[in-house]
Amino acid sequence: MKLSAVLLAIALLALSLVQCLGLPDPSTKCVMECDTQEYRSICAADDKGSTKTYRNLCVMKTENCLQNANFQKISDKECP
């Protein structure tokens, strides 16, 4: 009985330390708070030469993270 209480206390302490230290939750790695109302279109290209228009830079960065892509801004206007 005492052993299970001690193990429970250790588990709770470990959990609270993780929360207090602010260790990142891997499931929220790509969550970025983009202003979806902000329309500052950009043209971006990836390593393969593909181009894509994004609503704004934040949206591009978020999609890069979610899709494991590598688009980089090449201009401050829509792609041709």
From Swiss-Prot:
Gene3D superfamilies: 3.30.60.30. It is found in: Secreted. One of its GO terms (cellular component) is extracellular space. GO terms for molecular function: serine-type endopeptidase inhibitor activity; Wnt-protein binding. Disruption phenotype: High pupal lethality, a significant reduction in the number of chemosensory bristles at the wing margin and narrower distribution of wg. InterPro entries: Kazal_dom (IPR002350), Kazal_dom_sf (IPR036058). Residues 1-22 form the signal peptide. Residues 24-80 form the Kazal-like domain. Its main location: secreted. Strongly expressed in the developing fly wing but is excluded from the presumptive wing margin. The keyword Transcription does not apply. One of its GO terms (biological process) is positive regulation of canonical Wnt signaling pathway. It holds the Pfam family Kazal_2. The record marks T36, Q37 as: Reactive bond. Keywords: Disulfide bond, Protease inhibitor, Secreted, Serine protease inhibitor, Signal. Disulfide bonds join C30-C65, C34-C58, C43-C79. Interacts with wg; the interaction facilitates short-range diffusion of wg. The name 'pegasus' comes from the mythical winged horse able to carry Greek heroes over long distances. Increases short-range diffusion of the wingless/wg protein, enhancing its signaling and expression of target genes required for wing margin morphogenesis. May act as a serine protease inhibitor since it possess the Kazal serine protease inhibitor signature. This is Protein pegasus.
